[in-house]
Amino acid sequence: MPSPLVLIPTYNERGNLSSFIAAVRASLPQADILVIDDNSPDGTGILAEEIATQDAHVRVLHREQKEGLGRAYLAGFAWALERQYSHVFEIDADFSHNPKDLPRLLEATEDADLALGCRWMPGGGVSGWPWSRLGLSRFGNLYARLILGVSYRDLTGGFKCFRREGLETLGLDKIQSVGYGFQIEATWRALKSGLRVVEVPIHFTDRTVGESKMSGQTFKEALILVWRLRLGRS
Protein backbone atom coordinates (compact mmCIF):
# COMPACT_ATOMS: atom_id res chain seq x y z
CA MET A 1 0.00 0.00 0.00
CA PRO A 2 1.46 3.44 -0.94
CA SER A 3 2.69 5.42 2.04
CA PRO A 4 3.00 9.17 2.74
CA LEU A 5 6.25 11.04 2.26
CA VAL A 6 7.39 13.97 4.41
CA LEU A 7 9.68 16.42 2.60
CA ILE A 8 12.16 18.25 4.83
CA PRO A 9 14.24 20.86 2.97
CA THR A 10 17.36 21.82 4.89
CA TYR A 11 20.12 24.39 4.87
CA ASN A 12 22.24 24.56 8.03
CA GLU A 13 19.74 22.68 10.21
CA ARG A 14 22.19 20.29 11.89
CA GLY A 15 21.13 21.47 15.35
CA ASN A 16 17.50 20.53 14.70
CA LEU A 17 17.65 17.58 12.34
CA SER A 18 18.03 14.53 14.59
CA SER A 19 15.32 15.52 17.05
CA PHE A 20 13.03 16.73 14.27
CA ILE A 21 13.23 13.49 12.30
CA ALA A 22 12.59 11.55 15.51
CA ALA A 23 9.50 13.67 16.16
CA VAL A 24 8.19 13.11 12.63
CA ARG A 25 8.76 9.36 12.89
CA ALA A 26 6.93 9.24 16.23
CA SER A 27 3.98 11.23 14.93
CA LEU A 28 3.57 9.48 11.58
CA PRO A 29 5.43 6.14 11.77
CA GLN A 30 4.03 4.85 8.46
CA ALA A 31 5.59 7.73 6.52
CA ASP A 32 8.93 7.93 4.77
CA ILE A 33 11.06 11.06 5.08
CA LEU A 34 13.08 12.76 2.37
CA VAL A 35 15.67 15.26 3.57
CA ILE A 36 16.48 17.66 0.73
CA ASP A 37 19.78 19.28 1.61
CA ASP A 38 21.27 22.19 -0.30
CA ASN A 39 24.91 21.35 0.46
CA SER A 40 24.73 22.81 3.98
CA PRO A 41 28.13 24.08 5.21
CA ASP A 42 27.32 22.90 8.76
CA GLY A 43 27.15 19.24 7.71
CA THR A 44 23.38 18.80 7.80
CA GLY A 45 23.54 16.54 4.74
CA ILE A 46 26.21 14.36 6.31
CA LEU A 47 24.14 13.97 9.47
CA ALA A 48 21.09 13.12 7.37
CA GLU A 49 23.02 10.31 5.69
CA GLU A 50 24.07 8.97 9.09
CA ILE A 51 20.45 8.92 10.22
CA ALA A 52 19.38 7.25 6.97
CA THR A 53 21.83 4.38 7.51
CA GLN A 54 20.03 3.61 10.78
CA ASP A 55 16.43 4.12 9.61
CA ALA A 56 15.13 2.71 6.32
CA HIS A 57 12.28 5.24 6.35
CA VAL A 58 14.73 8.13 5.90
CA ARG A 59 16.19 9.10 2.52
CA VAL A 60 18.44 11.99 1.51
CA LEU A 61 18.47 14.06 -1.67
CA HIS A 62 21.64 16.13 -2.04
CA ARG A 63 21.60 19.28 -4.15
CA GLU A 64 24.80 20.97 -5.23
CA GLN A 65 23.95 24.44 -4.02
CA LYS A 66 21.36 26.59 -2.32
CA GLU A 67 18.80 27.48 -5.00
CA GLY A 68 15.80 28.43 -2.90
CA LEU A 69 12.97 26.73 -1.06
CA GLY A 70 10.79 26.45 -4.15
CA ARG A 71 13.32 24.51 -6.18
CA ALA A 72 14.05 22.24 -3.23
CA TYR A 73 10.38 21.35 -2.93
CA LEU A 74 9.98 20.86 -6.68
CA ALA A 75 12.88 18.40 -6.61
CA GLY A 76 11.20 16.62 -3.71
CA PHE A 77 7.84 16.49 -5.47
CA ALA A 78 9.44 14.94 -8.56
CA TRP A 79 11.19 12.37 -6.38
CA ALA A 80 7.91 11.51 -4.64
CA LEU A 81 5.86 11.19 -7.82
CA GLU A 82 8.43 8.88 -9.40
CA ARG A 83 7.98 6.55 -6.43
CA GLN A 84 4.18 6.72 -6.24
CA TYR A 85 3.79 7.97 -2.67
CA SER A 86 0.16 8.42 -1.65
CA HIS A 87 0.60 11.83 0.01
CA VAL A 88 3.39 14.40 0.14
CA PHE A 89 3.95 16.79 3.05
CA GLU A 90 5.78 20.09 3.22
CA ILE A 91 7.15 20.97 6.66
CA ASP A 92 9.90 23.18 8.12
CA ALA A 93 12.83 21.46 9.83
CA ASP A 94 13.12 23.93 12.71
CA PHE A 95 10.05 22.87 14.77
CA SER A 96 8.11 25.98 13.76
CA HIS A 97 5.62 23.40 12.47
CA ASN A 98 4.68 20.80 15.06
CA PRO A 99 5.13 17.24 13.74
CA LYS A 100 2.23 16.19 15.99
CA ASP A 101 -0.05 17.97 13.50
CA LEU A 102 0.95 15.68 10.63
CA PRO A 103 -1.86 13.15 11.26
CA ARG A 104 -4.47 15.92 11.29
CA LEU A 105 -3.37 17.21 7.89
CA LEU A 106 -3.31 13.68 6.53
CA GLU A 107 -6.82 13.04 7.81
CA ALA A 108 -8.04 16.28 6.23
CA THR A 109 -7.06 15.01 2.76
CA GLU A 110 -9.65 12.23 2.99
CA ASP A 111 -12.06 14.81 1.56
CA ALA A 112 -9.57 17.14 -0.14
CA ASP A 113 -6.59 17.17 -2.49
CA LEU A 114 -4.59 19.66 -0.43
CA ALA A 115 -4.64 20.44 3.29
CA LEU A 116 -3.12 23.78 4.32
CA GLY A 117 -1.88 24.32 7.85
CA CYS A 118 -3.42 27.67 8.81
CA ARG A 119 -2.12 30.03 11.51
CA TRP A 120 -4.82 32.64 11.03
CA MET A 121 -8.05 30.77 11.75
CA PRO A 122 -9.80 29.83 15.01
CA GLY A 123 -7.67 27.23 16.75
CA GLY A 124 -4.47 28.38 15.06
CA GLY A 125 -1.85 30.87 16.21
CA VAL A 126 1.76 32.02 16.34
CA SER A 127 4.25 32.10 19.23
CA GLY A 128 7.62 33.79 19.52
CA TRP A 129 7.26 36.46 16.85
CA PRO A 130 7.64 40.19 17.55
CA TRP A 131 4.68 42.39 16.67
CA SER A 132 6.52 43.64 13.59
CA ARG A 133 6.80 40.19 12.08
CA LEU A 134 3.25 39.28 13.05
CA GLY A 135 2.01 42.40 11.32
CA LEU A 136 4.11 41.72 8.23
CA SER A 137 2.79 38.17 7.93
CA ARG A 138 -0.83 39.20 8.42
CA PHE A 139 -0.43 42.00 5.89
CA GLY A 140 1.24 39.68 3.38
CA ASN A 141 -1.56 37.15 3.60
CA LEU A 142 -4.29 39.78 3.36
CA TYR A 143 -2.54 41.42 0.41
CA ALA A 144 -2.24 38.10 -1.44
CA ARG A 145 -5.87 37.20 -0.72
CA LEU A 146 -7.17 40.52 -2.01
CA ILE A 147 -5.04 40.62 -5.16
CA LEU A 148 -5.71 36.97 -6.05
CA GLY A 149 -9.35 37.03 -5.00
CA VAL A 150 -9.26 33.94 -2.80
CA SER A 151 -10.73 33.33 0.65
CA TYR A 152 -8.04 31.09 2.12
CA ARG A 153 -6.39 32.71 5.12
CA ASP A 154 -2.80 31.44 5.05
CA LEU A 155 -1.43 31.55 1.52
CA THR A 156 2.14 32.03 2.74
CA GLY A 157 2.16 29.04 5.09
CA GLY A 158 4.58 26.17 4.49
CA PHE A 159 2.89 23.26 6.29
CA LYS A 160 0.91 21.31 3.70
CA CYS A 161 -0.26 17.86 2.70
CA PHE A 162 -0.93 17.00 -0.95
CA ARG A 163 -2.61 13.91 -2.28
CA ARG A 164 -0.51 12.41 -5.06
CA GLU A 165 -3.33 12.83 -7.56
CA GLY A 166 -3.44 16.53 -6.74
CA LEU A 167 0.27 17.01 -7.32
CA GLU A 168 0.00 15.21 -10.65
CA THR A 169 -2.55 17.73 -11.93
CA LEU A 170 -1.08 20.86 -10.33
CA GLY A 171 1.17 21.86 -13.21
CA LEU A 172 4.43 21.74 -11.26
CA ASP A 173 6.39 22.49 -14.43
CA LYS A 174 4.73 25.93 -14.57
CA ILE A 175 5.87 27.04 -11.10
CA GLN A 176 8.56 29.71 -11.37
CA SER A 177 8.97 30.96 -7.80
CA VAL A 178 12.37 30.19 -6.34
CA GLY A 179 12.02 31.33 -2.73
CA TYR A 180 9.19 31.52 -0.23
CA GLY A 181 6.83 32.94 -2.84
CA PHE A 182 6.63 29.32 -3.91
CA GLN A 183 4.08 28.72 -1.15
CA ILE A 184 1.70 31.30 -2.59
CA GLU A 185 2.17 30.08 -6.15
CA ALA A 186 1.71 26.39 -5.30
CA THR A 187 -1.57 27.06 -3.50
CA TRP A 188 -2.75 29.42 -6.24
CA ARG A 189 -2.06 26.82 -8.93
CA ALA A 190 -3.85 24.18 -6.85
CA LEU A 191 -6.94 26.38 -6.75
CA LYS A 192 -6.71 27.23 -10.45
CA SER A 193 -6.43 23.52 -11.24
CA GLY A 194 -9.70 22.87 -9.45
CA LEU A 195 -8.20 20.95 -6.55
CA ARG A 196 -10.21 20.63 -3.36
CA VAL A 197 -8.38 22.67 -0.72
CA VAL A 198 -9.08 22.79 3.02
CA GLU A 199 -7.44 24.67 5.89
CA VAL A 200 -6.48 23.03 9.17
CA PRO A 201 -5.67 25.15 12.24
CA ILE A 202 -2.06 24.87 13.38
CA HIS A 203 0.11 26.65 15.93
CA PHE A 204 3.35 28.09 14.56
CA THR A 205 6.29 28.50 16.97
CA ASP A 206 9.33 30.53 15.99
CA ARG A 207 12.58 28.59 15.84
CA THR A 208 14.81 28.40 18.92
CA VAL A 209 17.83 26.76 17.22
CA GLY A 210 19.55 28.15 14.12
CA GLU A 211 18.83 31.24 12.06
CA SER A 212 15.75 32.21 10.08
CA LYS A 213 16.08 32.11 6.28
CA MET A 214 13.55 34.94 5.83
CA SER A 215 14.72 38.26 4.39
CA GLY A 216 13.44 41.52 2.98
CA GLN A 217 14.00 40.12 -0.50
CA THR A 218 11.58 37.31 0.37
CA PHE A 219 8.83 39.84 1.08
CA LYS A 220 9.53 41.81 -2.10
CA GLU A 221 9.38 38.63 -4.17
CA ALA A 222 5.94 37.81 -2.79
CA LEU A 223 4.61 41.33 -3.44
CA ILE A 224 5.58 41.12 -7.10
CA LEU A 225 4.55 37.49 -7.50
CA VAL A 226 0.88 37.96 -6.65
CA TRP A 227 0.51 40.56 -9.40
CA ARG A 228 2.24 38.29 -11.91
CA LEU A 229 -0.19 35.52 -10.99
CA ARG A 230 -3.17 37.88 -11.12
CA LEU A 231 -2.16 39.14 -14.58
CA GLY A 232 -1.34 35.67 -15.88
CA ARG A 233 2.35 36.35 -16.34
CA SER A 234 3.61 33.43 -14.27
Please annotate each region the language model reported.
Residues 30-40, 61-62, 91:
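Short beta-strand/loop segment that forms part of the nucleotide-sugar
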Residues 15-19, 42-51:
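Acidic helix N-cap motif at the loop->helix transition within catalytic regions
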Residues 151, 174-178, 187-204:
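Catalytic donor-sugar/metal-binding loop of nucleotide-sugar-dependent glycosyltransferases
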